[in-house]
């Protein structure tokens, strides 16, 4: 059984027991969260597709960790103008573990 959920502006294919990193969610460590924006649920041969979401469907997940991703380096330069700009960015993330799909 698997589901497709939307969180943080992205879509993820998830199944029970799977761990994944999503955009930062304001929740405490070891707390349970419910992802209610479920786009699709597949269980063997039966497949439910929402328009856009499936009513009453939810995916329960446990918050495992919060952290920051790897640094992305940005370098801007204008040729012949002696303009150079260096910048870095680290995106915050939340690691979750899927507990149940309903």
Swiss-Prot record:
Entry keyword Nucleotide-binding: no
A Pfam family matched in the record: Ribosomal_L21p
Cited InterPro entries: bL21-like (IPR028909), bL21-like_sf (IPR036164), Ribosomal_bL21 (IPR001787), Ribosomal_bL21_CS (IPR018258)
Keyword Ribonucleoprotein: yes
Disulfide topology: none
GO MF annotations, alphabetized: rRNA binding; structural constituent of ribosome
Record keywords, A-Z: Ribonucleoprotein, Ribosomal protein, RNA-binding, rRNA-binding
Superkingdom of origin: Bacteria
GO biological process terms on file: translation
One GO location term (cellular component): ribonucleoprotein complex
Protein family membership: Belongs to the bacterial ribosomal protein bL21 family.
Listed NCBIfam families: L21
Quaternary context: Part of the 50S ribosomal subunit. Contacts protein L20.
Role summary: This protein binds to 23S rRNA in the presence of protein L20.
Name of the protein: Large ribosomal subunit protein bL21
Native species: Neisseria gonorrhoeae (strain ATCC 700825 / FA 1090)
Classification of source organism: Bacteria, Pseudomonadati, Pseudomonadota, Betaproteobacteria, Neisseriales
Name of the encoding gene: rplU
């Amino acid at each position: 059984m698997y589901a497709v959920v939307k969180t943080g502006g992205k879509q993820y294919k998830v199944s029970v027991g799977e761990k994944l990193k999503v955009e930062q969610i304001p929740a405490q460590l070891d707390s349970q969260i419910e992802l209610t924006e479920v786009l699709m649920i597949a269980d063997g041969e039966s497949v439910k597709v929402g328009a856009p979401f499936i009513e009453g469907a939810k995916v329960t997940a446990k918050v495992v960790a919060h952290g920051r991703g790897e640094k992305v380096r940005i370098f801007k330069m204008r040729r012949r103008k002696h303009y150079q700009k260096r910048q870095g960015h680290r995106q915050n993330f939340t690691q979750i573990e899927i507990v149940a799909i309903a």
